[in-house]
A protein has these predicted regions:
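Residues on the lipid-exposed face of transmembrane beta-strands in outer-membrane beta-barrel proteins
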Residues: 7, 20, 37, 69, ...
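Membrane-embedded beta-strand positions of outer-membrane beta-barrel proteins
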Residues: 18-22, 88-90, 124-126, 195, ...
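Charge-patterned, long linear interaction tracts outside catalytic cores
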Residues: 187-188, 194-201, 207-220
Length: 238
């Protein structure tokens, strides 16, 4: 099958039109995890294992979350006349997630141009949409929040990178250190374009009715995706 997408086109009044829009949104986690705080953990665990009390009082949920802020900006230029018109839109979006790792930066553009010859016989059109997406995430944030001992501290001024080093061999980790020190992201580059050449033959055979259309067209298009995944752990971590 064939899918036809109608894109916004430029104006035909001979003027250049410019529009700009911006928006800011905020996101905050609603704390719904019913887990032990440090005092409850001490009352439950130290009865059978006094060594499990590491002396701190850490709210791991608060330690890994933040206020998420998203900025969005869009700028558009359009113009043209009865035979040629164009429209160019550029946008930028930066989203900071509610955990320390998650974020997304995205920017791109969409350009369209079309031209019809004076006799209305030929029409040429082209569209191009490039886009770049950078994103970071961690799949283990809230699992660590649930498992971590709330008497474990986050920071240790004596360690090489300033974070408390969890005992090896356990199933918990300093998730704050992991989110801040590790790099685990994806970069995606997208490019979509198409060009169309069309001919309307009917006016040649029936010049008395130029509004009638018998169109034949050829379209060439391409969709390209480049994806890069990167992961880095510094030597001071772990």
């Amino acid at each position: 099958g064939v899918i036809l997408v109608n894109l916004k086109k430029g104006t035909r009044d001979g003027e250049v039109h410019t529009t700009y829009s911006a928006a800011v949104t905020f996101n905050k986690a609603k704390k719904e995890l019913d887990i032990m705080n440090a005092e409850e953990y001490r009352a439950y665990r130290t009865v059978s294992n006094p060594l499990s009390d590491m002396g701190a009082s850490t709210d791991w949920f608060d330690a890994v979350t933040r206020l998420g802020v998203t900025h969005m900006h869009t700028l558009t230029f359009s113009g043209g006349n009865a035979r040629t018109n164009y429209r160019v839109t550029a946008d930028y979006r930066k989203a900071q997630g509610i955990d320390l790792r998650s974020d997304r930066r995205e920017y791109g553009a969409r350009a369209t141009i079309s031209h019809t010859t004076k006799d209305g016989l030929f029409t040429f059109a082209a569209n191009m949409t490039p886009r770049v997406i950078d994103r970071n995430k961690s799949a283990s944030v809230y699992g660590s929040v649930i498992k971590n001992n709330p008497t474990m501290p986050v920071y240790d001024p004596e360690s090489a990178n300033g974070y408390y080093r969890f005992p090896s061999g356990g199933d918990s980790s300093n998730i704050v250190e992991q989110l801040n020190e590790e790099e685990n992201g994806t970069e995606i580059k997208l490019l979509e374009w198409n060009a169309t050449a069309a001919v309307n033959l009917l006016p040649l055979f029936n010049p008395n009715n130029p509004n009638m259309v018998l169109k034949s067209q050829v379209t060439v298009s391409q969709y390209q995706v480049d994806k890069f995944n990167g992961w880095f752990i510094p030597s001071t971590y772990g």
